A protein has these predicted regions:
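Acidic, small-polar-rich N-terminal luminal/periplasmic segments of exported/outer-membrane proteins
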Residues: 22-122
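Conserved C-terminal beta-signal and adjacent last beta-strands/turns
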Residues: 8, 144, 337, 543, ...
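Face-selective signature of the C-terminal outer-membrane beta-barrel domain
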Residues: 265-294, 324-464, 507-509, 519, ...
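Structural signature of Gram-negative outer-membrane beta-barrels, strongest in the C-terminal barrel
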Residues: 339, 358, 362-364, 412, ...
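Gram-negative outer-membrane beta-barrel transporters
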Residues: 562, 569-573, 589, 593-689, ...
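Solvent-exposed loop segments that connect transmembrane elements
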Residues: 209-256, 300-332, 379-413, 453-493, ...
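Transmembrane beta-barrel wall of Gram-negative outer-membrane proteins
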Residues: 124, 131-162, 166-237, 262, ...
Length: 768
């Protein structure tokens, strides 16, 4: 689970690549104002999940909903992309604003809201095929129709065969995902209502999840250089094949992990989706589902310092020969989970004169049984690195005899365990009130009873850590072996709390074209079960998380431009983050739990422009300053040296201060269009203390879509048009490097994640 920050800027991003956008289903669009189409599937980091719309804070986890319910309750263990894809089983998608999401779900975030294809009286089929020049093939099929006058059916199949942009020698595919949907719908009372029973089966294996790192040479000016013989995005920084010895956190036994294992996910889900329009104008919706994922597993790779060693340092290759050259201390986490949830949401709504009222209820139950084991190893710095062995004394060995080993530091870095459940019972409402033709008020509130009961191991982690009663051993200065007793057991933590959310939005038209808008939203929550998988917050650290969002600005609209400009403030208190801190210049790391605040002040201007016939442009500019507050940590390493990190008032890592988006689209003919998407991400800091950074970069997309006739559509698109070879995210092992030390790292070998390489994709769609 390893709680790593994924950060988001505050701009709502409107996209225009038509091939990726879906319309709302008719029964939903009848009850909503028409919204801009927004492409959330163009993701420069991962082809298999939606991009994360940015609001200036770490992710609040689930941001995709299906038929009004979370696609996965929590993606901390059971990953979203393992159970949901934007496929032919969907009738359409929409985008919930932070205000809407806060009231309906308790999370302040832009969220994708998707709706299932339920069918219609006549038979229809959709077959989509996609491929790229690396060998990826994707087949997506939906069949739907009617049975008699009052029954509908739908069936879908999604198959993804993605080898990635480089060959993983230990497996054929970086992502192999299968999704199957079946559903039947009963039409009620001449179309006034419907009841649908839907089944979904997912089976996903995604070893590409841990193959997204690359070594590079860091230049002090924010740029990187390629290492000879290694092309980021085109070469693998994962071994060809092999197995590793590790210490199982739960059993305390040494076991073997084969690289082809550990990324398996499969789940079964059954859902009841219904709605009914009463004669008095009230619309009632009732949606519920049960999902069980007996395997929700994934693997994480991490890095540390890259250094040069000589033969005298004792590293050996698998054939027993001595090694000299560059090595990196690598880290691996094996995550094993079982997840189930039972979710229910019901809403009633009605237009009452100039009020549009909605009242809803959530009853969401989630059960988690999860643990992870970690180990460390040393590898060569090259494509398909070779694993190196070294002399190692296992702290669980009472003889304290050194043996040659490829793995070490078992469970020293953030092994996790928790088992338990959480439940949310919430009542919420919204009202859209048209006070006058010029003045509109939207407001809402949410009150949520939250109960969590989880097993927690609060004991600090150490080399040889596992559950149970046992001894670890160390050699004293006089040569004697000293034993230390351990009794590691989980203790139950139960919490009963009230969370709340509220929102108020005011819109006033000064003229027919120009107006003012302002809104304020607040949401609160307490630490979740996933945050107890590590050492977790103590009673003193257990505090309410509060997220206020305040925005205000202007809007202007005429025949050719729709423009808005807003100033935004958002903050989050008591954010919980588990950090692995590496001692600079070494491979040694320690895990600490951090609780801190973040606040962001920014300005965003967005425009939809239609300057001439057949041409549309979306443009966006954001300037923001996200900073840490109360961010302090210290750690003591094995040699007794204590080091600290103080990131107070420093820019949050990975968040750019400048964002630009340019998305032109031109209709060449009625059935042929060309589109581009350019996104600029300004300078981002790659560590906690503003010492290392990456220069700004462009993420670029483009394509042509051709509707050949009513039955056939074709498309071609390009990702990373200019084949930019940049790094992004953080730099491994750099957490404790300060500004004063930054100059020493000019020209140093480091590692981190990278942009998706130049990719050409082809698509075809058939309707029948």
């Amino acid at each position: 689970m390893n709680l790593r920050i994924r950060t988001f800027s505050m701009a709502l991003i409107a996209m225009s690549a038509a091939s990726q956008v879906y319309a709302l289903p008719s029964d939903e669009s009848e009850n909503k104002e028409k919204k801009e189409e927004r492409n959330v599937m163009l993701n420069a980091s991962d082809a298999n999940k939606p991009r994360e719309i940015q609001i200036g804070l770490p992710s609040e986890d689930v941001t995709v909903y299906e038929n009004g319910l979370p696609a996965v309750y929590s993606s901390s263990v059971h990953k979203l992309s393992a159970h949901w894809r934007s496929d032919a089983s969907l009738k359409g998608t929409d985008l919930m604003t932070p205000s809407e999401s806060a009231i309906a779900t308790g999370n302040i975030a832009y969220a994708v809201s998707s709706f299932s294809e339920l069918g219609q009286k006549e038979f229809k089929g959709k077959l989509n095929y996609k491929a790229n020049h690396f060998g990826m093939q994707n087949v997506d099929l939906n069949l739907s129709g009617g049975i008699g006058d009052n029954w509908l059916y739908t069936a879908s199949m999604y198959q993804n065969f993605d080898p990635g942009s480089f060959k993983l020698r230990f497996t054929d595919y970086a992502d192999r995902t299968q999704l199957y949907h079946f559903g039947i719908t009963r039409i009620l009372n001449d179309g006034k209502g419907r009841v649908s029973l839907l089944y979904k089966y997912s089976n996903s294996k995604n070893p590409g999840n841990f193959a997204n790192a690359a070594p590079f040479i860091y230049s002090g000016d924010g740029s990187i250089k390629k290492i000879d013989g290694f092309d980021p995005g085109m070469d693998s920084y994962v071994q060809r094949q092999g197995s590793f010895q590790y210490l199982n956190t739960k059993s305390g036994k040494m076991e073997t992990w084969n690289m082809s294992d550990g990324s398996e996910n499969h789940a079964n889900e059954i859902a009841l989706i219904s709605q009914y329009q009463f004669d008095n104008g009230w619309l009632w919706k009732f949606n519920a589902k049960y999902m069980n994922a007996p395997r929700a597993n994934y693997v994480d790779y991490g890095g540390s310092t890259i250094s040069q060693v000589s033969e005298a340092d004792g590293y050996q290759l698998s054939d027993g020969s001595a090694y000299s050259g560059y090595i990196e201390g690598r880290r691996t986490w094996l995550h094993v989970g079982k997840v189930s949830n039972a979710l229910l949401t019901t809403e009633i709504s009605k237009q009452l004169n100039n009020h549009k009222l909605m009242i809803g209820l959530n009853e969401w139950y989630y059960h988690l049984n999860y643990y992870s084991s970690s180990f460390q190893w040393a590898g060569t710095v090259e494509a398909y690195p070779r694993t190196l062995s070294q002399m190692y004394v296992n702290p669980l060995d009472p003889t304290q005899t050194a043996h040659r080993s490829e793995t070490f530091g078992y469970n020293e870095l953030s092994p996790e365990y928790t088992k338990g459940s959480e439940n949310k019972l919430a009542l919420y409402f919204t009202d859209e009130w048209k006070v006058s033709p010029k003045f509109k008020v939207f407001y809402g509130g949410r009150l949520e009873y939250y109960r969590m009961s989880a097993e927690q191991i609060s004991t600090p982690r150490f080399s040889g850590f596992h559950m149970g009663n046992y001894n670890t051993y160390a050699t004293a200065a006089d040569g004697s072996v000293v034993a230390t007793e351990h009794s590691i057991e989980a203790k139950n933590v139960t919490k009963d709390k009230l969370n709340y959310a509220a929102t108020l939005q005011l819109t006033y038209n000064l003229t027919r074209q120009f107006g003012l808008t302002a809104d304020a939203t607040i949401a609160t929550r307490f630490p979740r079960i996933s945050e107890y998988a590590g050492t977790g917050p103590t009673e003193e650290q257990y505090k309410r998380v509060t997220i206020p969002l305040i925005r205000g600005g202007i809007f202007y609209k005429n025949d050719w431009i729709d423009l808005s400009s807003m100033v935004t403030y958002i903050s989050k208190s008591n954010n919980i983050d588990q950090q692995n801190l590496t001692k600079p210049g070494t491979t040694e790391g320690k895990t600490v739990l951090l609780i801190y605040n973040i606040q962001t002040l920014g300005w965003t201007t967005s425009a939809e422009i239609n300057p001439f016939k057949n041409f549309h442009m979306h443009a966006l500019f954001t300037y923001q300053k996200p900073v840490y507050k109360n961010y302090n940590a210290s750690v003591t390493f094995s040699d007794g040296q204590s080091m600290g990190v103080n990131a107070n008032n420093m820019i949050v890592k990975e968040i750019p201060q400048v964002l630009i988006e340019l998305d032109p689209k031109y209709d060449i003919t009625k059935n042929l269009n060309a589109w581009l998407s350019f996104r600029y991400f300004g300078k981002t800091y790659a560590n906690l203390q503003e010492a290392l950074y990456f220069n700004g970069h462009w993420e670029t997309f483009g394509g042509i879509n051709w509707n050949v006739n009513k039955k056939l559509s074709l498309g071609v698109s390009v990702i990373n048009i200019f084949n930019e070879k940049g790094a992004k995210g953080t730099i491994s092992g750099s957490e404790l490097i300060t500004k004063q030390e930054a100059g020493k790292y000019d020209g140093k070998y480091m590692s981190g994640s990278y942009l998706r390489p130049f990719t050409v994709e082809f698509s075809a769609g058939i309707k029948f």
